[in-house]
Amino acid sequence: MEQFHATTIVCVRRGNHVALGGDGQVTLGNIVIKGTVRKIRRLYHDKVLAGFAGATADAFTLQERFEAKLEKHQGHLMRAAVELTRDWRTDRVLRRLEAMLIVADTEHTLVLTGNGDVLEPEHGLAAIGSGGAYAQSAALALLRNTELPPEAIVKQSLEIAGDLCIYTNQNHVIETLGA
C-alpha cells in the first residue's frame, strides 16, 4: 500500500528570531489528496515550533509523542528531543514510523530523524521533505546575502521549492518565535 507523503518544511534562524514554515500538500503516489494540511504547529505554551515531513499518520504520532516529552521536561527542547529519539530507536513500533521533525525554540533548532538522530544544523537553517534541498539552498543564499528577517526567507524559500518540487504547493503556513 502506498503511503501519504512528500512536503517541504524549512526553518531559518537569525539569533533568537526563528521562523518555521511548510507547504500544505499531501500526496498519495502521484495524486494530490489535499492541499491545505497544516504541518507546522506551536507546542508547549507557544514556546516551541514543530514541523513534520513524511508519512502523515506517522508524523502526527511522532509530534504527539514529542509534545508529551516537552511537557514532561517542562519545555526543555534538547532533553525532550533526546528522550523522544531514544524511544524512537528502541521501540519496535516507533522504529517503523517514516517521518522527520524540525523543532525549534528561541535558542535551538533541531532535526529529529527516523534513525533516532538529533541534529543541530549549521548556518541557522534546516529543511526536510521532498523539496527540502531546494528550500535549504534558497534559504542559505538569502541568509548569506540579504538582511531579510527569517519569516521572509522562509516564505521565499518555500515559493522556490514549490516552483521546483512537484510534491510541494504554494499554500504556506509560517510561524515565528522571538524578534
UniProtKB/Swiss-Prot annotation:
Catalytic reaction(s) noted: ATP-dependent cleavage of peptide bonds with broad specificity
Organism: Bordetella pertussis (strain Tohama I / ATCC BAA-589 / NCTC 13251)
One BP term from GO: proteolysis involved in protein catabolic process
Domain of life: Bacteria
InterPro entries cross-referenced by the UniProt entry: ATP-dep_Prtase_HsIV_su, Ntn_hydrolases_N, Proteasome_sua/b, Proteasome_suB-type
Self-association state and partner proteins as the record states: A double ring-shaped homohexamer of HslV is capped on each side by a ring-shaped HslU homohexamer. The assembly of the HslU/HslV complex is dependent on binding of ATP.
Cellular component, GO annotation: HslUV protease complex; proteasome core complex
The protein, known as: ATP-dependent protease subunit HslV
